[in-house]
């Protein structure tokens, strides 16, 4: 006796339901500009603003709630580590002088460097779901861990070279050729936008741009006397993959 064949469910083609928790990872690049100064003896030109560039990768966790009109509200936290750094010749700094003998100390010539170890954000998201694609904007709090260095490269004869030379600090004490701060954590703000596409089986791929701004931070340098300040603005471009812990589409049709 013949039996009736059972039809297999059709492939999911309905609009995505983004409601639920999700977790994933991302990779990308970060670039920006910093502003490094000695407290009390600022650099007189713009050479103290090195560009920084590097790769980063990290993880993210969030929650979305989709409403009947296709608007999506959510919150997301992420953290990414990398090697985002840069440096340049900064010019001279009055009051921080080059080592020499029987000479009038000229202002020391410096290179300045900035290095970011990791960045994290906690942000609210507002998006709109169009079929299987989510378009969204975000804004919230940004955190970074970074360090700052100023290298003295000016010789006693007043001729510059790429060899680091000892300097006299603001207290007139001869110290090493490098003024560096320990790594420090500071808080700023972030805004961004992106798009996410449902790949099926609760997986999705995303592309995102974020702008992070961190206000000026002051830290005691390694000589124990001199203070360095630093502020930075960073742009991130990230590609990522997420897994949603909830049904990804309206459902199969039989």
Regions found by a protein language model. Give the residues of each.
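Gram-negative outer-membrane beta-barrel domains
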Residues: 1-254
